[in-house]
Structures are given as C-alpha cells and as structure tokens.
C-alpha cells in the first residue's frame, strides 16, 4: 500500500488507524491504494504490534437460560458501541473449566474480561488480580476486590418481595431458593428470611431449586401436596416461578384468588404467562 501510494508505511498506518493528523490529499492517495489492493488490517498482527487487541472477553457459567442470552446481548451491544469485539466462552459448571476459560481469553490477548463465574474460588480470583489482569466480576462480591465487582442488593430485593406478600396479609409463606452454593442465592434467601423474622413469622418451607423451570415445578408441587399448603410462594428467579405456576395450575388453584406467587427479577417471558408475573 505504501509503495503504490508513494508514502511511508508509517503514513499508511496512521490513515488505517484513523489518525486525523494526515493531510487530505495524502489520505486520499492511501485510501485509493487500499481500495485498489483490497487491503484489510490484520487484527492479530495489530495486537502483536501494540499492547491492545480491541477485544473484550466474557466468561459465563453457562449458555443456557434467558438470563445468559440477555447478558451476552447487552455486553456485545455495549462493547460494539466502543469499537470493541467480544469473545464469549462458558465455564461449564466447574471451577477447572472456568479457570481454563479465563486463561484462554487472556491468552487471546483480550484487553479485559468480564467474569460471571460461579465455581471459581475467591483465591483464584485474587491470583488473577495479583497478576495485574484486567477483569470485572459480575454478580459476585470478593473481599479485597470490591473495586472490580458489579453486583446487586439481593437481600433488599428479596425483602421487598417478601414484604409485599406480608402487606397483602399472607402468613403462610414458602420460598423456593436457588442453589445454596451460589453467593447470590444465599443473599436472596437471606433477604426472605430477614423479612419473615422482622414480622416474627416462621416460613412454611424453604426449598432449594436450581433456577430452572423443572425445579420450580418440582418444589411447588411438593409444597402444594402438604396438608397445610402455603398461601403464597416466593420464587428466587423468574424461571422457577413459571415452573411453579404450572404446578399451581395442575393443582387446579387460581392465582391470586387461591394462592399468591411472586418472583425475583422479570425476564422476557414473565408478561406472557397467565396470569402474568
């Protein structure tokens, strides 16, 4: 390109990289040469020649479920708005797989990585920080890495949901939580328990699901088979609530006339079930 345009390689580099400090006639010569030769920049070569790859990485626990699809969509949209590419991989539900996924993205010279990991230990994450790796943790709070953590006030949200049931007059309330090994699941359950304790009311039951339709259905069915069933159920995510709603319908109960149902978060499907969540 430089030879055809009659300029230096440094000038071509400035034009290709969008440097405004190039005179218009020179820029036009370079652009004509680029078009004539069909030249396209090599991102890998650029990354090797500089300290930046213009690429971000995302590690998710899984690709399954509406949450992860929405997460990837939002992250990619934001990355592209800043001229960045996005590489996505999954941890496949084990600490070793999550660690390999993280190392793989850094080996590909990602400028930074967003981690939505469930099994990777706090010590491993501190090790990454000690290695001066650029990463942000999503929905995870690690002591000593607070400045890298983007999380939510799970206890507050759960207290608000539970309080709504209490304010409606319910006293026989059950909870279907997420997997207890997840910090965020424990925090959601904590908020439910705090609201119940503040009202001096004992929960009917606190069953453990896995944030999917099947576990929500299974736990709700178990609750509804009790001799003294709950008058309200709090589900710690939308998918379990939809599964619970199916069980309620199969028991020929009406929401909210016979039993109330409330859930943490609201995804794309919540408005389309009947009654809408």
PLM region spans:
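Bacterial carbohydrate/catabolite-sensing allosteric modules
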Residues: 36, 74-85, 100, 106-107, ...
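N-terminal helix-turn-helix DNA-binding module of bacterial transcription factors
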Residues: 1-53
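Amphipathic helical "hinge" segments at domain boundaries
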Residues: 39-104, 108-112, 190-193
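Short beta->alpha connector loops
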Residues: 92-95, 116-121, 239
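Short beta-strand scaffold positions
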Residues: 2, 115, 232-236
């Amino acid at each position: 390109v430089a030879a055809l345009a009659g300029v230096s390689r440094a000038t071509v580099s400035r034009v290709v990289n969008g440097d405004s400090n190039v005179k218009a006639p020179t820029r036009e010569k370079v652009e004509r040469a680029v078009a004539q030769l069909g030249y396209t920049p090599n991102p890998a070569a650029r990354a090797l020649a500089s300290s930046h790859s213009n690429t971000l990485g995302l590690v998710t626990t899984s690709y399954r479920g509406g949450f992860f699809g929405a997460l990837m969509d939002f992250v990619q949209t934001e990355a592209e708005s800043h001229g960045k590419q996005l590489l996505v991989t999954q941890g496949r539900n084990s600490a070793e797989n999550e660690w390999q996924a993280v190392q793989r993205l850094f080996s590909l010279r990602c400028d930074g990585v967003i981690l939505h990991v469930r099994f990777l230990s706090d010590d491993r994450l501190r090790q990454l920080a000690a290695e001066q790796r650029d990463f942000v943790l999503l929905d995870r709070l690690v002591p000593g890495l607070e400045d890298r953590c983007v999380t939510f006030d799970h206890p507050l949200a759960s207290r608000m949901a539970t309080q709504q049931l209490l304010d409606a007059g319910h006293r026989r309330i059950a909870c279907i939580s997420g997997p207890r090994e997840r910090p965020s699941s424990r925090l959601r359950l904590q908020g439910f328990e705090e609201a119940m304790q503040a009202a001096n009311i004992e929960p009917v039951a606190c069953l453990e699901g896995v944030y999917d339709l099947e576990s929500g259905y299974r736990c709700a069915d178990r609750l509804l088979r009790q001799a003294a069933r709950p008058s309200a159920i709090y589900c710690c995510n939308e998918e379990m609530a939809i599964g619970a709603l199916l069980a309620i319908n199969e028991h020929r109960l009406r929401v909210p006339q016979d039993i109330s149902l409330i859930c943490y978060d609201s995804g794309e499907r919540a408005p389309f079930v009947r009654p809408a969540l």
